[in-house]
Amino acid sequence: METESAAASGESFTSVTSKKTRKRRAAEERPMDTGEQPSKRPDFPPISGDKLMGDKDEMRKVPVPSHRYTPLKENWMKIFTPIVEHLQLQVRFNLKTRNVEIKTCKETTDVGALTKATDFVRAFILGFQVEDALALVRLDDLFLESFEVTDVKPLKGDHLSRAIGRIAGKGGKTKFTIENVTRTRIVLADSKIHILGSFQNIKMARTAICNLILGSPPSKVYGNIRAVASRAADRF
């Protein structure tokens, strides 16, 4: 009798499952989503050059010192042509302010054209040949670096003159050798030194010039830069 009542009461029991078990079963029964998931990062189409620059035209001014007026006048067409035809910019020489003014226009499509043209004109004003400065327009990995002899070593009077003479060499031989080995262009303007080239080549030329200023003999400097240049060539 007691066993029958226990059996009857046992039929009314319900099994209780935990919350974790219910979640796991629901996840197993749910079909696996193998479709392409939408990316969380926004995907915007590239903006064209004219929209990026906006309606307002940008302008840069490059000051021209008095000793560069004549070279600028003689080489004006060589400077004017690539800026207008290749970079699609407007350029003029303001006689009142003595500045070369470069301006964007409706035809300008390249966002970096204004910077390239400014670097090109600035390189010519510093003393580089038009053909050498034009490389700044054609190539993207070229830079200009300027420093003074006194930045390396505080020299004065005859000591400063001798340091500049060591950099130039007899008939410009030392300067030409550094240019050829490091594939750079160097301008010596009084105590200022301007180097045009790629980042790695500028570094090699700058190291050689600094060693000459600090008093190293040219023969030792030649050997060092040739060794560095050959290692760089083997690396690439």
From Swiss-Prot:
KH domain location: 152-209
Transmembrane region positions? none
> Keywords on this record?
Nucleus, RNA-binding
Q: Which InterPro entries match?
A: KH-I_PNO1_first (IPR055212), KH_dom (IPR004087), KH_dom_type_1_sf (IPR036612), KH_PNO1_2nd (IPR055211), KRR1-like_KH1 (IPR041174)
- Indicate where this protein resides in the cell: Nucleus, Nucleolus
One GO CC annotation: nucleolus
**What's a Pfam family this protein contains?**
KH_PNO1_2nd
Q: Which cysteines in this chain are paired by disulphide bridges?
A: none
- Where does it primarily localize? nucleus
Point to the regions of Basic and acidic residues compositional bias.
26-43
Per the UniProt entry, what is one GO biological process?
ribosomal small subunit biogenesis
Gene3D superfamilies named among the record's database cross-references: K Homology domain, type 1 (3.30.1370.10)
Q: Which GO molecular function terms does the record list?
A: RNA binding
Q: Where is this region: Disordered?
A: 1-59
As for family, the record states:
Belongs to the PNO1 family.
Biological function: Part of the small subunit (SSU) processome, first precursor of the small eukaryotic ribosomal subunit. During the assembly of the SSU processome in the nucleolus, many ribosome biogenesis factors, an RNA chaperone and ribosomal proteins associate with the nascent pre-rRNA and work in concert to generate RNA folding, modifications, rearrangements and cleavage as well as targeted degradation of pre-ribosomal RNA by the RNA exosome. Positively regulates dimethylation of two adjacent adenosines in the loop of a conserved hairpin near the 3'-end of 18S rRNA.
Q: How does it assemble?
A: Part of the small subunit (SSU) processome, composed of more than 70 proteins and the RNA chaperone small nucleolar RNA (snoRNA) U3.
Under which name does UniProt file this protein? Answer: RNA-binding protein PNO1
**Record organism:** Xenopus tropicalis
